[in-house]
């Protein structure tokens, strides 16, 4: 880093006590923060939005839910073109990558819990999207640093007992969790762009 350079990070700990700015990158527009659709919680509808790659933890998640006797479904949004048939598992539905904001918001609204099974993350946009649509989020211990001061994020161990225990907790306390989530101050695209 030269003497005229300035460090920019999305997390304070990444700066390692060096001078720099903390930014909150975001693609959240006003569209994400209005016209909320009430979630129905009788049937658990899990959502994952992201690439279908090992490092994203999706295969680990599929293994965790494979033998469950709980009534639920999982929608995966992020398959590459012509690869939606790569995952064949009961109650799992795979869809291609969705880039249209309106359609993506509908996916979040049509589900009641978002799952981010990644092994590593920096500043996941999908986490902000789920929170913007007031959908509780389940993550695993490896990325618990992404929680920060945000409400509505739950940490599970990477096993089915812990995962479904968290789902049950969310299902039984959904309204209260959503009330807490309304207190979240999420970064927006406009706020991010004003910094530069």
Regions found by a protein language model. Give the residues of each.
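A conserved mid-protein helix/loop that constitutes part of the nucleotide-sugar donor-binding site
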Residues: 44, 48-67
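Short hydrophobic beta-strand element within catalytic cores of glycosyltransferases
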Residues: 132, 136-140
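Aromatic "clamp/platform" in nucleotide-sugar-dependent glycosyltransferases that forms part
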Residues: 119
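Nucleotide-activated donor-binding/catalytic signature segment of Leloir-type glycosyltransferases, i.e.
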Residues: 84-99
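Short alpha-helical donor nucleotide-sugar binding micro-motif in glycosyltransferases
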Residues: 106-111
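A charged, aromatic-enriched C-terminal amphipathic alpha-helix characteristic of glycosyltransferases
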Residues: 174-196
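Conserved acidic donor-binding segment of nucleotide-sugar-dependent glycosyltransferases
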Residues: 141, 152-161, 167-174
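Donor nucleotide-sugar binding/catalytic pocket of nucleotide-sugar-dependent glycosyltransferases
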Residues: 1-40
């Amino acid at each position: 880093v030269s003497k005229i350079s300035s460090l920019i990070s999305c997390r304070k700990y990444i700066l390692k006590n060096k001078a720099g700015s903390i930014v909150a990158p975001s693609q959240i527009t006003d569209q994400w923060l209005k016209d909320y659709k009430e979630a129905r919680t009788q049937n658990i509808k899990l959502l994952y939005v992201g690439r279908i790659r090992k490092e994203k933890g999706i295969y680990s998640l599929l293994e965790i839910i494979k033998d469950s006797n709980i009534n639920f479904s999982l929608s995966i949004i992020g398959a590459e073109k012509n690869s939606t048939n790569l995952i064949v598992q009961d109650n799992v539905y795979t869809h291609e990558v969705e880039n249209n904001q309106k359609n993506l918001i509908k996916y979040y609204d049509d589900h009641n819990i978002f799952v981010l099974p990644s092994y590593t993350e920096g500043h996941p946009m999908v986490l902000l999207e789920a929170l913007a649509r007031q959908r509780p989020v389940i993550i695993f211990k490896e990325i618990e640093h992404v929680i920060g001061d945000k409400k509505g994020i739950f940490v599970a161990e990477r096993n089915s007992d812990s995962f479904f225990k968290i789902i049950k907790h969310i299902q039984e306390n959904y309204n209260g969790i959503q009330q807490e989530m309304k207190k979240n101050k999420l970064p927006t695209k406009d706020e991010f762009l004003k910094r530069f």
